[in-house]
A protein has these predicted regions:
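NTP-dependent nucleotidyl-transfer catalytic core
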Residues: 1-225
């Protein structure tokens, strides 16, 4: 476990360093985008590294679930890239439904009364968070037989989820009428009043936060003799 914790820390540091170089180095930025497309296309090289990263991350998530007695397992919890194989089919579904329009080379879904479309495929062939979210809904509805799907994400993503839910309905990807709900909340801010960002560091980790909550609750209960 000590090794896994170190590897997770290494991944976080790697992510921050990569983001810094991505912002300042055009060649690195282009190669990074190419690597994403390769990963989404199933390239062996990128996929091998992804599997190592995702296994490390998910093992820590599972530890938190067990600590909180949440009954989730690997069939319920899937990393973003686990939907890669399903992304082309998602695009094809919307294409066959005549819901896609090309805009500056990208494939988009436009909604009546809205200026901003939902972009589902970039001009270079890469997919986006929206594409993955659409694939995830289809998986949860069809494979997990979910009746209600809740998204606990801060309110800045409200438009994104409204568009996702609308696109799902337009394409008929929710045949059992599962309830799709965005449980919006306020933005988590650091001591400077700015949103936390993984890429910039300084995050409060969930595991020590839970441990502190348990410790404080235990102290409080001991004081009132419960």
């Amino acid at each position: 476990q000590g090794h896994d914790s170190k590897l997770l820390t290494d991944l976080e540091n790697f992510y921050r360093s990569a983001k810094k170089q991505f912002d300042s180095d055009e060649d690195f930025r282009n190669r990074s985008r190419e690597a994403v497309v390769n990963l989404q296309s199933g390239s062996d090289f990128e996929s091998e590294h992804w599997k190592t990263f995702i296994e490390t991350s998910m093992s820590h998530c599972q530890e938190i679930y067990e600590r909180l007695r949440i009954n989730l397992n690997s069939s319920h919890v899937r990393g973003e890239s686990s939907y890669n194989d399903a992304l082309p089919a998602v695009i094809q579904t919307f294409k066959e439904s005549n819901l896609l329009e090309e805009s500056e080379g990208a494939q988009c879904i436009f909604f009546e009364g809205q200026k901003s479309p939902l972009i589902v495929q970039k001009a270079d062939g890469g997919f986006l968070y929206a594409t993955t979210d659409l694939a995830a809904v289809r998986y949860r509805v069809n494979e997990l037989a979910a009746h209600r799907i809740l998204y606990f994400v801060d309110s800045r993503q409200s438009l994104h989820f409204r568009q996702i839910f609308a696109a799902i309905e337009l394409a008929g990807l929710n045949p059992n009428a599962a309830s799709l709900e965005h449980m919006a909340f306020g933005t988590m801010l650091n001591e400077e009043g700015k949103p936390f960002k993984t890429r910039e560091g300084g995050l409060i980790k969930l595991k020590p936060l839970i441990e502190e909550a348990i410790s404080r609750a235990t102290q409080t209960l001991s004081l009132i003799h419960i």
